[in-house]
C-alpha cells in the first residue's frame, strides 16, 4: 500500500503522488468522466488573466493545469512538492519548481494570480497554505481554488458519496498505477469543508471578496478571491 492518511504528512503525500504520477492524467480523466477538462477551463476563465500576467499554479502535478492557464497568454509557473509528478509532466513546456505550499520558494508580491486545483485538500495546514499564497501575491491579485466539494442536491449527494466510497476505488484498481491512493482521495473529499466553510477559511487567511461557483452540481467548487 502506498497512500497517505488524513494526517497528511507531507512526505507521505509526496510519496503517494510520486507513485501515481505515470498514469495520473488518464486516471483523472476516466474517473471524472472527462469533466476534468471543463474544470480546468473554468478555472482559467474565472481568473480573467491577461497576457503578461505572472501566475503561480500550486500543486500543479504534471502541469496539465498550468498548460491550460498559459492559453490566456499569461506567464505561468508550475509548483509541486512531488518531484515524480513534475517529471511526469516534463513534456509540457512551462517552468517547474519543486516546492511546499506552506513554504513557497518565492519572494513577497511576486504574482498577479495564484491558483491551486485539487491540491489544497492535500496540504497539511491548508489555511497556512492560503496565507502563504497571499504572501506571494501582489496587492489586488487574484486567487482561484478549484477543489472537490459538496453536491448541493441531497439525493445526488447520496449517489455521489456512494460512487466516491465504493465505485471509484474499484475503477481506480483498473486504471491507476497506485489504486490505494484513490482510497485516500475518497476519504479526504468526504472530510473536506463544504463551500461556505472553505470560503470563511479563505477569508481568514487574508483574502477578500471571496465567492464561489459550483461546478458539476457541486462535485467541484471554484472559489475566487482577491487580495
Swiss-Prot record:
Keyword Transferase among record annotations: yes
Cited InterPro entries: SAM-dependent_MTases_sf, UbiE/COQ5_MeTrFase, UbiE/COQ5_MeTrFase_CS
A single MF term (Gene Ontology): demethylmenaquinone methyltransferase activity
Keywords: Menaquinone biosynthesis, Methyltransferase, S-adenosyl-L-methionine, Transferase
NCBIfam families: MenG_MenH_UbiE, PRK00216.1-2
Protein name per its UniProtKB record: Demethylmenaquinone methyltransferase
Enzyme class: transferase
Catalytic reaction(s) noted: a 2-demethylmenaquinol + S-adenosyl-L-methionine = a menaquinol + S-adenosyl-L-homocysteine + H(+)
Its biological purpose: Methyltransferase required for the conversion of demethylmenaquinol (DMKH2) to menaquinol (MKH2).
Pathway: Quinol/quinone metabolism; menaquinone biosynthesis; menaquinol from 1,4-dihydroxy-2-naphthoate: step 2/2
UniProt similarity note: Belongs to the class I-like SAM-binding methyltransferase superfamily. MenG/UbiE family.
Biological-process GO terms, alphabetical: menaquinone biosynthetic process; methylation
Residues bound to S-adenosyl-L-methionine: 62, 80, 100-101, 117
